[in-house]
Amino acid sequence: MVFKKTQPSPSLKNPERIQSFKKLSKKIGIKFSKIEYYNTAFIHSSYKNENPEILEDNERLEFLGDSVLGLVAARSLFQKYPKASEGELSRIKSKIVSTPILNSIAEKLNLGEYLLLGKGEKNSQGKGRRKIAANLFESLVGAIYLDRGFEVAEKFIVQHLLEFAENPDMEESVRDYKTQLQEYSQKHFKTLPVYRMKGESGPDHSKMFQVSVRIRDQWEASGYGASKKIAEQNAAKELYIRIRRGF
């Protein structure tokens, strides 16, 4: 994520700062009632530490946003995948609220443009920068929740998080558990895993596939995904982890 180098004053009396939030409001399609929430959402703790006049940073909003994200993700997945087990739902949830996903959405929305960041943090790279961006998305969710309520926050999350996470283009980022399972099965069981399509559900534009994988009659697991490929990967992951753990 690219963070703005020349940053305006955090004061809401500053025309440039106010204009930036009008731009953000239009971009995400949400009318801001209390801009002060969003102002705080985009003040990093490092900026507050370097500017004693700043009374609050975005960490509390980040905490709140993380909780709202978790609830929305859990409820949405519970409703969308009625046949998925608790373990499967937990794995899907952990993926879609992970730092890489939140960072990708923050970059897509260019949230770094609005962030007030300390001089030291501006030079952060790699995981540190991705974590800042992911936390920024959470603090924005917290601000939306306080300002507009749960329903508006939920709509924003579903639009920018859950749909993004189910994008088939993300298949390339899925760890190749099929290959790992195949290699392990050949080495220890002298046979190949067998995949079987178990079913599909949902409308045409948002299909959910279920695939099972079996090694002989000894090991079997199922996986779900927005495509057959992802479902196979998730099934392979489930079985591979079970085998390695011995159950």
UniProtKB/Swiss-Prot annotation:
It catalyses: Endonucleolytic cleavage to 5'-phosphomonoester. GO terms for molecular function: double-stranded RNA binding; metal ion binding; ribonuclease III activity; rRNA binding. Gene3D superfamilies: 3.30.160.20, Ribonuclease III domain. The active site is at D66, E138. Signal peptide: none annotated. It comes from the Bacteria. Digests double-stranded RNA. Involved in the processing of primary rRNA transcript to yield the immediate precursors to the large and small rRNAs (23S and 16S). Processes some mRNAs, and tRNAs when they are encoded in the rRNA operon. Processes pre-crRNA and tracrRNA of type II CRISPR loci if present in the organism. Belongs to the ribonuclease III family. This is Ribonuclease 3. The lineage of its organism: Bacteria, Pseudomonadati, Spirochaetota, Spirochaetia, Leptospirales. The gene is rnc.
